[in-house]
């Protein structure tokens, strides 16, 4: 039994009130479970008050649009106004995406890096408000330093992997290739020591929380962008198709939800409906099959990006692999005595489309939960009707990871061109040893 003394007035005596621990717990649980319970300022716990105060300082997403668009749509209801705005900027982004694809792999890699930096800035700005409130030293500088270090490591890994032969031929860059991982580790250790030296008494817990915040942000955006670039080098189709599937699912789920949505899907995103989720899923599978069939006809999209020693440059020409060579499939299983010619990649595209439509949206739900925790509408307002860059790429990062794992598990086979690149990086005597071993082994096999 716990006694709670309550003073009714300044001159009134103390009143002893006995409250059982179990009753108090039940009251707290019922209050927490009540969906319509709203805490008063006095009832709010310190953490809730802190989040409320923090939310006032965070950059809130807005629905601002260009004035010319506002004036043109002023007579429309808000629901249809938002529909038109989202539609216009969706098509603008699709056209921009097409132009970047036309620019080739280098344009895609630069765009990936820029998107990554912007996403990191949007996430870290929330933590930066915590830094400003508490006066924590060096938080923003350390965050950007760790971003630079992480990019040096991951992008360097890609450069060494795909451009190692070219870089090794430049004398002053050879050192960076040979000791890339050691240099990356040394740069990280500098940041680590910098963080330790910046620790301030009273704020240890908060500083370590923000240190973790930065590293989780790096895990979300830098690691995923590294995987995206690996997917690009496997062939543009492994980048374009999954990205387009997420876009298609997002658009079609919005369309089906807008016209037919009645049943709420998840509390984290009240506007999401089962009708939109299911309709978007079917549309994505159909779109994935048709879009994949079109891209499979062009070497530009299906060939992996490799360095050609003969041509002395990176190439996107190849003999199409089994995945992109039409195969004959019998339809007897379905009671039809005919055959169908299909690219094997189409079957893989169905797996990708199912993931993008069933699991992909959970990347968006995760982001919605994060935004609700800090009581913000969007990560930013860079794209009218859509929010910030992170609001558009929350599902893309999850999809990129799946595609990378899918390729390494079910698709990737040893690449002769990549093996040659690694051999060219060896010393002449090591290359000669490999040559002799191959010669002897092949001789034994042929005799």
UniProtKB/Swiss-Prot annotation:
Q: Name one GO cellular component term.
A: endoplasmic reticulum membrane
Q: Which PROSITE patterns match?
A: CDS (PS01315)
The alphabetical list of record keywords is: Endoplasmic reticulum, Lipid biosynthesis, Lipid metabolism, Membrane, Nucleotidyltransferase, Phospholipid biosynthesis, Phospholipid metabolism, Phosphoprotein, Sensory transduction, Transferase, Transmembrane, Transmembrane helix, Vision
* Modified residues annotated as Phosphoserine in this record: 30, 34-35, 40
Where does the chain cross the membrane?
A: 88-108, 147-167, 180-200, 203-223, 227-247, 276-296, 350-370
Quote the tissue specificity entry: Retina. Localized to the photoreceptor neurons, both in the compound eyes and ocelli.
Instruction: List, alphabetically, the Pfam families matched.
Output: CTP_transf_1
Q: Name one GO molecular function term.
A: phosphatidate cytidylyltransferase activity
Q: What happens when the gene is disrupted?
A: Lethal during the late embryonic to early larval stages. Hypomorphic mutants are viable but male adults are sterile, whereas female adults remain fertile. Impairs spermatid individualization showing abnormal mitochondria morphology and defects in lipid compositions and lipid-mediated signaling. RNAi-mediated knockdown results in low insulin pathway activity and defective cell growth in certain tissues. Various non-adipose tissues display excessive fat accumulation such as the salivary glands, proventriculus, hind gut, Malpighian tubules and trachea.
Key word Transmembrane present: yes
> Briefly, what is this protein's role?
Catalyzes the conversion of phosphatidic acid (PA) to CDP-diacylglycerol (CDP-DAG), an important precursor for the synthesis of phosphatidylinositol (PtdIns) and phosphatidylglycerol (PG). Required for the regeneration of the signaling molecule phosphatidylinositol 4,5-bisphosphate (PtdInsP2) from PA and maintenance of its steady supply during signaling thus playing an essential role during phospholipase C-mediated transduction.
Family from the record: Belongs to the CDS family.
This protein is called Phosphatidate cytidylyltransferase, photoreceptor-specific
Which species does this protein come from? Drosophila melanogaster (Fruit fly)
Q: What is the lineage of its organism?
A: Eukaryota, Metazoa, Ecdysozoa, Arthropoda, Hexapoda
UniProt gene name: Cds
């Amino acid at each position: 039994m716990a006694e709670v003394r309550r003073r009714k007035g300044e001159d009134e005596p103390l009143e002893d009130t006995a409250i059982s621990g179990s009753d108090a717990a039940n009251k707290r649980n019922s209050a927490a479970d009540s969906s319509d319970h709203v805490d008063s300022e006095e009832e709010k716990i310190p953490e809730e008050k802190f989040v409320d105060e923090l939310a006032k300082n965070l950059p809130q997403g807005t629905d601002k649009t260009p004035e010319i668009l506002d004036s043109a749509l002023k007579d429309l209801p808000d629901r249809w106004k938002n529909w038109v705005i989202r539609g216009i900027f969706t098509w603008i982004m699709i056209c921009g995406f097409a132009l970047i694809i036309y620019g080739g792999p280098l344009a895609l890699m630069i765009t990936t890096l820029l998107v990554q930096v912007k996403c990191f800035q949007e996430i870290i700005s929330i933590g930066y408000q915590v830094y400003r409130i508490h006066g924590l030293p060096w938080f923003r500088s350390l965050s950007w330093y760790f971003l630079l270090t992480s990019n040096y490591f991951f992008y360097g890994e890609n450069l060494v992997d795909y451009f190692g032969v070219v870089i090794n031929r430049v004398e002053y860059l050879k050192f960076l290739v040979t000791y890339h991982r050691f240099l990356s580790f040394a740069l990280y250790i500098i940041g680590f020591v910098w963080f330790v030296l910046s620790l301030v008494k009273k704020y240890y817990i908060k500083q370590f929380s923000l240190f973790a915040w930065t590293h989780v942000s790096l895990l979300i955006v830098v690691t995923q962008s590294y995987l995206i670039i690996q997917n690009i080098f496997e062939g543009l189709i492994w980048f374009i198709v999954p990205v387009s599937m997420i876009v298609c699912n997002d658009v079609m789920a919005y369309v089906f939800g807008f016209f037919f949505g009645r049943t709420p899907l998840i509390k984290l995103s009240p506007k999401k409906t089962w009708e939109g989720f299911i309709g978007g899923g079917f549309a994505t599978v159909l779109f994935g099959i048709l879009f994949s069939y079109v891209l499979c006809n062009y070497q530009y999209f299906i060939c992996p990006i490799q360095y050609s020693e003969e041509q002395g440059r990176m190439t996107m020409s190849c003999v199409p692999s089994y995945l992109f060579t039409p195969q004959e499939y019998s339809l007897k299983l379905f009671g039809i005595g005919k055959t169908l010619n299909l690219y094997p990649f189409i079957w893989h595209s169905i797996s990708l489309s199912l993931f993008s439509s069933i699991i992909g949206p959970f990347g968006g739900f995760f982001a919605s939960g994060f935004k609700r925790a800090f009581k913000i509408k969007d990560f930013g307002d860079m794209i009218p009707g859509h929010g910030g860059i992170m609001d558009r790429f929350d599902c893309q990062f999850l999809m990129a990871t799946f595609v990378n794992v899918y390729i390494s598990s079910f698709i990737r086979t040893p690449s002769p061109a990549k093996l040659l690149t690694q051999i060219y990086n060896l010393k002449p005597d090591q290359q000669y040893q490999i040559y002799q071993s191959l010669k002897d082994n092949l001789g034994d096999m042929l005799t």
